[in-house]
């Protein structure tokens, strides 16, 4: 059974391990999100932003990182450890988080070359609104979902 729980500082190690597992096999150029590469940055996210643990049978298997902004909720990250990808866990967890904010505009960006990520967000009703150039020429797809 999937459960979504607000993360606390003591969750840092299990979230960091899940993030590294989730992005270990990425075929997209680059080294992954900065919170995947830096335990310190992920710790700052836990202290200053809204982070959620995705639990499967009581064990953390993923996470969601949300940066509330004045005009939107910015989804900085969604990840499920490699051993549980493709099971619908991320879709269930993000769907639950979306339901917790019934009147909001959600935004995110993901590598445009990562077709699996793009498909994941589109399945959840996010609309592609454009692209943005990143470091090293990597292109990011911009997404938005309005819930009212």
Question: Where on the chain are the PLM-derived regions?
Answer:
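Conserved beta-strand in the GNAT
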Residues: 53, 59-67, 74-79
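Conserved acetyl-CoA-binding loop-helix of GNAT-fold acetyltransferases
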Residues: 80, 86-99, 119-123
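Terminal substrate-recognition subdomain of acyl/acetyltransferases
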Residues: 138-148
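Conserved GNAT-fold acetyl-CoA-binding loop/helix
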Residues: 16-43
């Amino acid at each position: 059974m999937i459960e979504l729980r607000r993360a606390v500082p003591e969750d840092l190690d299990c979230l960091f391990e899940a993030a590294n597992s989730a992005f270990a096999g990425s075929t997209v150029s680059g080294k992954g999100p900065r919170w995947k590469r830096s335990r310190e940055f992920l710790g700052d996210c836990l202290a200053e932003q809204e982070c959620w643990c995705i639990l499967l049978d009581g064990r953390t298997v993923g996470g969601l990182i949300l940066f509330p902004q004045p005009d939107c909720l910015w989804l900085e990250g969604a990840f499920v450890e490699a051993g549980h990808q493709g099971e619908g866990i991320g879709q269930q967890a993000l769907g639950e988080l979306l339901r917790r904010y019934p009147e909001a505009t959600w935004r995110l960006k993901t590598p445009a070359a990562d077709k699996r990520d793009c498909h994941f967000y589109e399945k959840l009703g996010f609309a592609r609104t454009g692209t943005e150039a990143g470091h090293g020429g990597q292109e990011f797809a911009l997404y938005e979902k309005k819930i009212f």
